[in-house]
């Protein structure tokens, strides 16, 4: 039995998220269906990070086991021919049998893209959040400093979050401006349900001047979701990278735009 790693890109608009659901199409379902056809046997996959409805990925990492005798090209080109246009395999490699895309990961990287312009973009409308009011990214980055390290993120988890602990370790949280785009890059060991989008919603209030950077610290300390801002929309969020002990994968979304 061999263990294979896949690097996947997908546009999440038409899916209920990564995880297989009985009622709606999912990225996992489409991928497993195509892999199973190439392998001529049932294939189940594990991913590095389960994205929510409407969230995208430029570098989702997946692994699966199979004893089917197929060249690596079959796992990429053959499967891609069966996948829908909005899901594609970018790379494939054989890895150690102990490798697990989820549990071997050291950290994960997400980008949230904001199009900060007086006029909306027809081209980028489905790819990023449009904000027509000017954002102060210096204040937003000041607020980000309160997010670093291992902390209780209860104020930024959804009511449906099933994690048995609200603690997460954030190694990087930063806004970067490139032209009309503002990119929020966040790196952490893992993330709670809706955590990044809830953070973005609150950081936008700081950027628009409705709250001070220190307000983020206050919201963290009260450990109450109702004290934070509304959840930012899903279509601006991208899973862009994973780091493992021996290698890493990262494709920042802004580098694909600009």
Curated annotation (Swiss-Prot):
Functional description taken from the UniProt entry: Formation of pseudouridine at positions 38, 39 and 40 in the anticodon stem and loop of transfer RNAs.
Residues reported to bind substrate: 110
Record-given protein name: tRNA pseudouridine synthase A
Gene Ontology molecular-function annotations: RNA binding; tRNA pseudouridine(38-40) synthase activity
E.C. number(s) listed in UniProt: 5.4.99.12
Isomerase as UniProt keyword: yes
GO biological processes: tRNA pseudouridine synthesis
Top-rank lineage group of the source organism: Bacteria
Key words of the record: Isomerase, tRNA processing
């Amino acid at each position: 039995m061999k263990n294979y790693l896949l690097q996947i890109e997908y546009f999440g608009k038409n899916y209920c998220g990564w995880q297989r659901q009985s009622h709606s199409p999912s990225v996992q379902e489409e991928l497993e269906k195509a892999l199973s056809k190439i392998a001529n046997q049932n294939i189940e996959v594990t991913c590095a990070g389960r994205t929510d409805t409407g969230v995208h990925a430029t570098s989702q990492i997946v692994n699966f086991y199979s004893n089917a005798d197929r060249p690596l090209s079959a796992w990429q080109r053959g499967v891609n021919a069966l996948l829908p246009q909005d899901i594609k395999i970018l790379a494939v490699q054989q890895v150690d049998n102990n490798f697990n895309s989820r549990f071997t990961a050291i950290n994960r990287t997400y980008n949230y893209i904001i199009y900060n312009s007086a006029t909306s973009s027809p081209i980028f409308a489905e790819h990023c959040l449009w904000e027509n009011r000017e954002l102060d990214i210096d204040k937003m980055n000041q607020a980000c400093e309160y997010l670093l390290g291992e902390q209780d993120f209860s104020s930024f988890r959804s009511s449906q979050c099933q994690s048995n602990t609200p603690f997460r370790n954030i190694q990087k949280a930063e806004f970067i401006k490139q032209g009309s785009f503002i990119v929020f890059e966040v790196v952490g060991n893992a993330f709670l349900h809706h955590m990044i989008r809830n953070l973005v919603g609150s950081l936008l209030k700081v950027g628009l001047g409705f709250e001070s950077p220190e307000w983020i610290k206050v919201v963290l300390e009260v450990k109450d979701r109702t004290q934070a801002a509304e959840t930012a929309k899903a279509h601006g969020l991208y899973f862009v990278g994973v780091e493992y002990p021996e290698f890493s994968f990262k494709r920042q979304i802004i580098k694909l735009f600009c």
